[in-house]
């Protein structure tokens, strides 16, 4: 008994002074001896409330040792009073103190569990109910129960809202028993079915669409709900532990939304009808390769000159319909770059290129995270099932976040609790974090992003560009392997080289793709507003010993009809007009400022259409 008590002393000190809440109270170590235990002298006195006659019979060193063990002075005084006798041995007092601890240990442990979940944002009554049903030891079961309660509350609130807001004509909106609606869900893709189901459960369409995109097309309903819940938990965690000035700002924003937003009426319109598998008209090593477009290109849009326009796939409602209507009503080709590399990048492409005899640039990229970055395998936990990264963004996770994750994981020597796993996985998917050490996650560096996007090493490095600008430029760029696969059909058509009008060039993704396809670029007229990006393209042009002409414009407005006609007369016309709008106003990661094609950057699409029409009009005149 005494020997196990000595071991318990060290365990108590860890709980009282350490960060870990996961303490193993069981031990088989019976080799410790009380004779080896030394009291540390320290001038600590118990409170004056203890009787003087008792205090005088206990040495200061003994009292100090009890305090160092973590016992309060009030508890020590009480133990001394109860054991007051002729002998007054310290061992008897220690036994009494341990009895006090044992009686409060269970309630203290239970309180820690309750406080843990309340801090994560769960209601106290839900936590208590879950612990009554599942006990206080199985954290995973408690977490699942709490998530279930949250979903039930959401569904109930959604149903209440429907009763209060909607008239009889809207009653069927939230009824899954409707035969027509069931048929529609059965005929739609897995993503569409999950999206509709989540909307019926009361989730915002934006949140649901982003979660589905992040989790992947094959994710189950449970995985998507877990992702949304983890996102909500993370937001609540940030609000709880935010610095005072940030917390006040969050609260003010909440109040502002409460007073300014009007209730949203349920909307049955689709964001956009995206294919279940984003393989476009076909991708390498995948069945379903098409030899002909499902909807032929209108005669008025046939090339040459050819054109190629890219934008993000997940856009606000109606955006792709508007893009298509301005580009000769050509049906978009939606492709996810995960079929070409280890990172997803869902994009839509409208072009008039042939689709037969496409080929992949060599060597092809590695297809999984572990193949692309083999050093991560050693540290990758079994509960992180990712093989692909999500879309590469223009910003990265903060060092504070990765530090917070490391601290959370280091609290547990054994199996990481399910709730912690879910939170970590949410942050990993959101920020594309990879494992670089034990319990250590890090965002991709710019060199790794270059590799995934298909650019040559150090393509964006040096030349005065900052790390922040590198991330921004890479996040808005083409995925070279994907674009090269589409442009590969041009190689046999232009054996003597090609003239390119490159609009919103960025860091030269289109030019890199043509170079890797070994298609000679006779002329490239580039329009790019960023000085850093223009420097990157110019450096690439020089380092790859291009023999053609590179002519640069900073302002797209300078490319009026007269300038375009003069350039075409000078260079003999353009064979390819390539471009794409930065995704700042369209992408889910920037949803707070998302305004569709009317945004500051995405409205450049209309300049693309204006210039393309001028090029095609001049080309018709030149052919006469």
Swiss-Prot record:
Residues 57-100, 108-149, 188-231 form the UBA domain. Its main location: nucleus. Residues 166-185 have a biased composition (Acidic residues). Disulfide bonds: none annotated. GO terms for molecular function: DNA (cytosine-5-)-methyltransferase activity; DNA binding. GO terms for cellular component: nucleus. Its EC number is 2.1.1.37. GO terms for biological process: defense response to fungus; DNA methylation-dependent constitutive heterochromatin formation; methylation. The keyword Magnesium does not apply. SUPFAM superfamilies: S-adenosyl-L-methionine-dependent methyltransferases. Keywords: DNA-binding, Methyltransferase, Nucleus, Repeat, S-adenosyl-L-methionine, Transferase. Pfam families: DNA_methylase. InterPro entries: C5_MeTfrase (IPR001525), SAM-dependent_MTases_sf (IPR029063), SAM_MeTfrase_DRM (IPR030380), UBA (IPR015940). Involved in de novo DNA methylation. Controls asymmetric and CpNpG methylation. Required for FWA gene silencing but not for the maintenance of SUP gene silencing. Functionally redundant to CMT3 to maintain non-CpG methylation. Involved in RNA-directed DNA methylation. Belongs to the class I-like SAM-binding methyltransferase superfamily. DRM-methyltransferase family. This is DNA (cytosine-5)-methyltransferase DRM1. It comes from Arabidopsis thaliana (Mouse-ear cress). The gene is DRM1.
